[in-house]
Amino acid sequence: AASDVYKRQDLEGQPIIPALCDYVVDTSRGTTIESGGHRVSTIEHIMSALWTLGVDNAVIDIDAPETPIMDGSACAYAKAITETGVADQDAERKFYHVTEKMVYTIPEKGVAIILYPDDEFSVSVHVDYNSKVIGNQYATFNPGDNYAEKISPCRTFVFLHELEPLIKMNLIKGGDLDNAIVVVENPVPADQLEHLKKIFNKPDIEIKAGYLNNLELRCNNELARHKLLDLLGDFALLGVRIKGRVWATRPGHFANTEFMKQLKHTIRRAGE
């Protein structure tokens, strides 16, 4: 199988960590892989760009335990790959043709990932967090779509009420929000808004249509597109490309990587 590997240049012996779903050890805040006690975390954005833009067998040199978050999207990675260009390797690319429908669900969380047989690879994502701000959002990625333009610039998002405990424990610094869209679901009292202005060192911070105005949205379904970006990054951990149509509702790194393990097992059984 054609898989990418991370090389931890900051550690003695420059250990290698394969970017495969078998090595996933944590999905709480992004996807983390580990081999021989060495980890690399938040790999999904760079994996998304590499995989979708057709790069296999990459060696990713890294001098830290986490990939650079950049602006919270895969834009910088996609731009670098597109500008550098991709060279053909002297090897045939392996594809797994999906032969039967495969379903993965976490019913209590409303999560579902379904894979159907198809001649091409495509992904549709639906997000619904019972949020009056986000509402129902859909995003699709079909063969021939421009990933670098359409998907890679879409940034990660977080709900303000999820941030509040972290803010109270001083785990969030001012610059931390330059790479996340903050969704404000509930009314924010004036004193809390003042507190946010101080933390983020932005005196003109305000809430606009349910979002903190630290960032402008890049498109109206940016959140669904970002979930799609993440899902593509987790698909990269299969180590083989597939021909099939994916439909995902409320995907997340735990569900994505569990689904990949299940799919990998199916592929192994099929002996491809």
Say what each PLM segment does.
Residues 1-56, 61-272:
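C-terminal regulatory domains involved in ligand/effector binding and gene-expression control
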